[in-house]
């Protein structure tokens, strides 16, 4: 597992599991990955997530969501925006709208991890972690 970019690793694992139509995937459990998974669950992109293991071996088991009998993934695209080599910040007036409001941007703010919609309502800006649609 990539120890330096846990969010990038998490998004890649979810993307790969979606392409392979897996029911679950495991990612390293950190406070940040738990917060991002919580936002994805609240927005309906994943079914659930739970923590397993102890200490260094803690993992988040994420249950993915599909629609129809052909099992089309709910998540079409997961795009990492702010990376360790190039951080992307946005103030409250310039928060991005993803696909005109169809998708979400996950923002790391001083009030915690939230969607672009919640950040706009709260009136805070922050680091743009990723886009999901």
Swiss-Prot record:
Keyword line: Ribonucleoprotein, Ribosomal protein, RNA-binding, rRNA-binding
Molecular functions per Gene Ontology: rRNA binding; structural constituent of ribosome
InterPro entries per record: Ribosomal_uS8, Ribosomal_uS8_CS, Ribosomal_uS8_sf
Transmembrane regions listed in the UniProt entry: none
A Pfam family recorded for this sequence: Ribosomal_S8
GO terms for biological process, alphabetical: translation
Gene Ontology CC terms, in alphabetical order: ribonucleoprotein complex; ribosome
Purpose of the protein: One of the primary rRNA binding proteins, it binds directly to 16S rRNA central domain where it helps coordinate assembly of the platform of the 30S subunit.
PANTHER family in the cross-refs: 40S RIBOSOMAL PROTEIN S15A (PTHR11758)
Subunit structure: Part of the 30S ribosomal subunit. Contacts proteins S5 and S12.
Family label: Belongs to the universal ribosomal protein uS8 family.
Protein name: Small ribosomal subunit protein uS8
Gene that specifies this protein: rpsH
């Amino acid at each position: 597992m990539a120890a330096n970019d846990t969010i990038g690793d998490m998004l890649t694992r979810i993307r790969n599991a979606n392409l392979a139509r897996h029911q679950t995937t495991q990612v390293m459990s950190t406070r940040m990955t738990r917060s991002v998974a919580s936002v994805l669950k609240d927005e309906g992109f994943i079914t659930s997530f739970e923590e397993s293991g102890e200490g260094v071996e803690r993992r988040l088991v994420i249950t993915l969501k599909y629609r129809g009998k052909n099992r089309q993934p709910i998540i079409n695209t997961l795009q990492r925006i702010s990376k360790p080599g190039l951080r992307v910040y946005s103030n409250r007036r310039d928060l991005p709208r993803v696909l005109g409001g169809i998708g979400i941007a996950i923002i790391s703010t001083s009030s915690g991890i939230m969607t672009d919609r919640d950040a706009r309502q709260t009136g805070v800006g922050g680091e743009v972690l990723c886009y999901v649609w």
